[in-house]
Curated annotation (Swiss-Prot):
GO terms for cellular component: host cell plasma membrane; membrane; virion membrane. N-glycosylated. Residues 21-75 are annotated as: Hypervariable stalk region. The gene is NA. It is a single-pass type II membrane protein. SUPFAM superfamilies: Sialidases. One of its GO terms (biological process) is carbohydrate metabolic process. Pfam families: Neur. Catalyzes the removal of terminal sialic acid residues from viral and cellular glycoconjugates. Cleaves off the terminal sialic acids on the glycosylated HA during virus budding to facilitate virus release. Additionally helps virus spread through the circulation by further removing sialic acids from the cell surface. These cleavages prevent self-aggregation and ensure the efficient spread of the progeny virus from cell to cell. Otherwise, infection would be limited to one round of replication. This is Neuraminidase.
Length: 454
């Protein structure tokens, strides 16, 4: 009898445990990550939903960020100098970490964030596929982006477009990207809006269609860019485009005989667009084009005797047309117009891509002398520099009542100047402020060659 009672008690205990376990597992969800974010888009409004799993209880929190229109109607902020904003140290980190081989980096900001865009070579630093990446145009090049100040790696970067020439900007609602790829005699620009292909532009001169390598400029929901097609050492064709929600709504070919525009750096100012470009044909000063939202334009060259291109002659007497001395070849650069004055960014060296400085010429937009009142060191002449370009921070991002001017500098390393199998670069950036600043040198700082080069 005792044995029968004991057996029944054990069976009852087993049944009790089984029922209890079934009730518990029935109330539990399947295993989930602790935090899961889902971003949806509803009527151009970002809805960021974050699920937080605490003690098997789910709480749903929503943070809604309404889109805005980046007006671009404000004037540039008054500034007295440039404060350092970012430095990614990509080459230094890439000697050991997984960092993309890149060139042509640039920065662009929305009303929420700033991102670094760059053209990869489909390869990582210190890897065999980095060999031969001195080449500008290949089918492996892609436009990608990452948060500003971070080294561009496969783990923090977002694919944007297949491209060996590119531009990007944000209108307050979505990112517009422009990526050019294809053969030299028939390349096509692919326009994407919010990551979706919305339009294309075919090469119209069949001679290396190319664009800014820096941000496009947005005003009142429209974004504007400049493209070039034709010889790099002679008269070419130049068009300005108005783009709305990723679609070209208007374009105008510039009537610009004896002008040469490449790799324009564009920015909005009081509702209009100003672009300062590269003359690769015959000018050691920089050409400019300014236009309104209807693409009614004016053209000229920066008149200052402080020359902005590279190579260039020593400073002297400028011209409001192309300065032909040392005018062939060139480098992407930028300037900011303030009335008759101009902030000029340029390499320190007159004949190599090294050093960088910012110079304020109070009458340099229209005057031909070489007098200046401010010079701020950015990179020492003993360190490599490279391309440079403008980007702005809108009032919707900064909370200011003006458009903040900023710039980035590419710090090129490797071929053709150094004994490596690769060419890549890191970048630094600065923004204009009306408070204390300091001149110094912020070089790339990587020790070459790498293991792959030995």
């Amino acid at each position: 009898v005792i044995g029968i009672v004991s057996l029944m008690l054990q069976i009852g205990n087993i049944i009790s445990i089984w029922v209890s376990h079934s009730i518990q597992t029935g109330n539990q969800h399947q295993a989930e990550p602790c935090i899961q974010s889902i971003i949806t888009y509803e009527n151009n409004t970002w809805v960021n939903q974050t699920y937080v799993n605490i003690s098997n209880t789910n709480f749903l929190t929503e943070k809604t960020v309404a889109s805005v229109t980046l007006a671009g109607n404000s004037s540039l902020c008054p500034i007295s100098g440039w404060a350092v904003y970012s430095k990614d140290n990509g080459i230094r980190i890439g000697s050991k970490g997984d960092v993309f081989v890149i060139r042509e980096p640039f920065i662009s900001c929305s009303h929420l964030e700033c991102r670094t865009f760059f053209l990869t070579q489909g390869a990582l630093l210190n890897d065999k596929h980095s060999n031969g990446t001195v080449k500008d145009r290949s089918p492996h090049r892609t436009l990608m982006s990452c948060p500003v100040g971070e080294a561009p790696s496969p783990y923090n970067s977002r694919f944007e477009s297949v491209a060996w020439s590119a531009s990007a900007c944000h209108d307050g609602t979505n990112w517009l990207t422009i990526g050019i790829s294809g053969p030299d005699n028939g390349a096509v620009a692919v326009l994407k809006y919010n990551g979706i292909i919305t339009d294309t532009i075919k090469s119209w001169r069949n001679n290396i269609l190319r664009t800014q390598e820096s941000e496009c400029a947005c005003v009142n929901g429209s974004c504007f860019t400049v493209m070039t097609d034709g010889p790099s050492n002679g008269q070419a064709s130049y068009k300005i485009f108005r783009i709305e929600k990723g679609k070209v709504v208007k374009s105008v070919e510039l009537n610009a005989p004896n002008y040469h525009y490449e790799e324009c750096s564009c920015y909005p100012d009081a509702g209009e667009i100003t672009c300062v470009c590269r003359d690769n044909w015959h000018g050691s000063n920089r050409p400019w084009v300014s236009f309104n939202q209807n693409l009614e334009y004016q053209i000229g060259y920066i008149c200052s005797g402080i020359f902005g291109d590279n190579p260039r002659p020593n400073d002297g007497t400028g011209s409001c047309g192309p300065v032909s001395s040392n005018g062939a070849y060139g480098i992407k650069g930028f300037s900011y117009k303030y009335g008759n004055g101009v902030w000029i960014g340029r390499t320190k060296s007159t004949n190599s891509r090294s050093g960088f400085e910012m110079i304020w010429d109070p009458n340099g937009w229209t005057g031909t002398d070489s007098n200046f009142s401010v010079k701020q060191d950015i990179v020492a002449i003993t360190d490599w520099s490279g391309y440079s370009g403008s980007f702005v921070q809108h009032p919707e991002l900064t909370g200011l009542d003006c458009i903040r001017p900023c710039f980035w500098v590419e710090l090129i390393r490797g071929r053709p100047k150094e004994s490596t199998i690769w060419t890549s670069g890191s970048s630094i950036s600065f923004c204009g402020v009306n408070s204390d600043t300091v001149g110094w040198s912020w070089p790339d700082g990587a020790e070459l060659p790498f293991t792959i080069d030995k």
